[in-house]
Regions:
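Glycine-centered tight beta-turn/hairpin loop motif at sheet-sheet or coil-to-beta transitions
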Residues: 105, 130, 227-229
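Serine endopeptidase catalytic core focused on the charge-relay Asp
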Residues: 153-361
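Protease-domain processing segments flanking chymotrypsin-fold serine proteases, especially trypsin-like
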Residues: 20-96, 143-151, 156-238
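Short, surface-exposed beta-strand/strand-loop-strand elements in extracellular ectodomains
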Residues: 116-131
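Extended extracellular/luminal ectodomain segments enriched in beta-structured repeat modules
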Residues: 102-109
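Bacterial Sec-dependent N-terminal signal peptides
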Residues: 1-25
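Solvent-exposed serine/threonine-rich low-complexity stretches and specific carbohydrate-binding patches
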Residues: 132-143
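Exposed beta-strand and adjacent loop surfaces of beta-rich binding modules
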Residues: 107, 120-122, 261, 328
């Protein structure tokens, strides 16, 4: 019996340098306490017409060849010169902080069109109660493209905290071009129209017994934040050299905007079979390079900006080109923005034409 594993980013067929690796530590404000200013300047994002987005989503959600939208992108120009508060910490050290609020948001994430830090500098981003902290982001996150996308943080306000030590080689370049207001939650609310807990009944949490035989392949699959406000699915794939080059396979219809600011979140799995429980959010890689794509067969091959570290415990999935139709198929994916799922098709695949390309269905 021949099985074929399908990483279900081809939703038309099945429903649907370094990167953003954090380098630990804690915000220096935790240690400084009362010695720094308690009042952090706040930028409040403007309101937008949610009813227009809801109407668009009602139509778009019926489409199987576009990413699933979860947020609204505020286009901004926020940097360390025109916003926030600088404080002199003495001995040549400086601290910059800024609070960004988008009223009613379930999550907030950022896109930096300029990100380049000197050695020794640290950037932390956290929500108001510091229940979720991203960082430290450092010069190890610098890329040739000088941009960066961030993962989603829960809540409608976040704080950016940049620490600069003495005698840095150059001034940091930090400029935010997008603040994404999440209005459909990817994290932990089953009451949102889609997202966590809202995939179809044919989808099983990967921790369930049905997923156990596919434990390795499950570790290759990631959910992607595309263009700041949409999501898709894809998988790390192996190559014939087996050298762990971080090639990542996703769908052509996911392409839009620059892949250099895409965020790839691994291990977003429910730790319980039932009911679904939110998974970890901090196994992320920011940025990739597009290597190849084809609209007819709906594929896009990327190379991540860095290989996931060993602590991520990822797997590089195998592939084959025999052309032999499978007798059954398995899909591992993040349907409708949910935690990772596995589903099964026990019927033999048949050949079909899709956008002029030969496919299995």
């Amino acid at each position: 019996m021949k099985n074929t594993l399908l990483f279900s980013f081809f939703v038309a067929l099945f429903s649907y340098s370094q990167a953003q690796i954090s380098y630990g530590g804690e915000p220096i404000s935790n240690k400084l306490g009362a010695s720094i200013n308690k009042e952090i300047p706040t930028l409040i994002m403007p309101s937008f017409d949610q009813t227009v987005l809801d109407a668009e989503d009602a139509v778009n959600d019926l489409q199987k060849n576009i990413p699933w939208r979860f947020g609204f992108n505020h286009m901004v120009n926020i940097n360390t010169q025109n916003s926030g508060l600088w404080e002199d910490l003495g001995k040549g050290r400086k601290l910059w902080r800024l609070r960004i609020e988008s009223n009613g948001a379930t999550t907030i994430n950022l896109t930096f069109n300029k990100y380049y830090l000197p050695a020794g500098a640290k950037l932390f981003i956290y929500n108001d109660d510091k229940s979720e902290v991203l960082g430290a982001l450092t010069d190890q996150n610098n890329k040739a493209t000088m941009d960066l996308g961030t993962t989603l943080l829960s809540g409608d306000a976040i704080i950016l905290e940049y620490f600069e030590p003495k005698n840095v080689a150059f001034e940091a370049q930090l400029n935010i071009s997008k603040v994404t207001h999440g209005y459909r939650k990817l994290l932990n609310s089953p009451n949102i129209e889609k997202g966590f807990g809202n995939s179809g009944s044919c989808n099983n949490n990967v921790i369930c017994p049905e997923g156990l035989p596919w434990g390795n392949q499950i570790r290759s699959v990631a959910v992607i934040v595309v263009n700041g406000n949409e999501n898709c699915t894809g998988a790390l794939i192996n190559n014939t050299c087996e050298d762990e080059t971080p090639y990542f396979l996703t769908a052509d219809h996911c392409l839009g905007g620059s892949v250099s600011t895409w965020v790839f979140r691994f291990n977003w799995d429910s730790p319980d079979c039932s009911p679904s429980v939110n998974g970890p959010y901090n196994f992320t890689i920011s940025g990739a390079t597009q290597l190849a794509n084809n609209g007819g067969s709906d594929f896009a091959l990327l190379e991540l900006s860095s290989a996931p570290p060993s602590s991520y415990n990822v797997y590089y999935a195998g592939w084959g080109n025999t052309g032999t139709a499978p007798t059954n198929s398995i899909a591992i994916h993040h349907p409708s923005g949910d935690v990772k799922k596995i589903s099964f098709d026990y019927d033999p695949a048949s050949t079909a034409s899709w956008n002029g390309a030969d496919t299995w269905r």
